[in-house]
């Protein structure tokens, strides 16, 4: 289900058709300024000004996470209201794997879909446990994710233990 920036339900094709889409998957408990900055910083990376104007920043909340299943319905409406209050369109999915979300969005958005992630989310992409049901495991999942214009924008973070800034080149992956 997709909600427009005013909180009203919309067809995904209407708001995403032939537009670059920047997707941030979070729980949004609560919506933080860094969430909005992550999307804004990723959008600024577009070369053409006309592409930046056409780009859609999209919050994605999955209800497929079994660990969060107990409280997902109790506060989902509050999170949707908070995202609408900051003017962020929202996609609510039951797709646990990002490659499934990418496939869904590629039906509507062109020329590209960009997933925006912090360093912890980036490292989680390489965790093999969620992909045990795929014959190719994590490699198959990554291959299915990064296809036909789907990319990842990594937002730097600070290591809580050392204070060092973590980037794609310095983050530890499993």
Residue positions per predicted region:
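Nucleotidyltransferase catalytic core that binds NTPs
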Residues: 1-174
């Amino acid at each position: 289900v997709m909600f427009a920036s005013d909180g009203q339900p919309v067809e995904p094709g209407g708001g995403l058709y032939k537009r670059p889409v920047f997707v941030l998957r979070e729980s949004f408990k609560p919506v933080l300024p860094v969430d909005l900055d992550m999307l804004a910083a990723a959008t600024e990376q577009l070369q053409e000004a006309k592409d930046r104007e056409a780009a859609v920043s999209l919050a994605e909340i999955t209800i497929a996470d079994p660990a969060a299943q107990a409280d997902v319905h109790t506060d989902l409406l509050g999170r949707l209201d908070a995202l609408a209050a900051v003017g962020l369109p929202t996609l609510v999915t039951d797709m646990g794997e990002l490659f499934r979300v990418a496939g869904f969005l590629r039906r509507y958005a062109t020329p590209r879909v960009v997933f925006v992630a912090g360093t912890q989310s980036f490292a989680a992409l390489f965790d093999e446990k969620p992909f045990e049901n795929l014959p190719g495991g994590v490699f198959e999942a990554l291959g299915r994710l990064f296809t036909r214009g789907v990319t990842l924008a990594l937002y730097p973070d600070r290591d809580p233990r050392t204070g060092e800034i973590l980037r794609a080149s310095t983050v530890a992956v499993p």
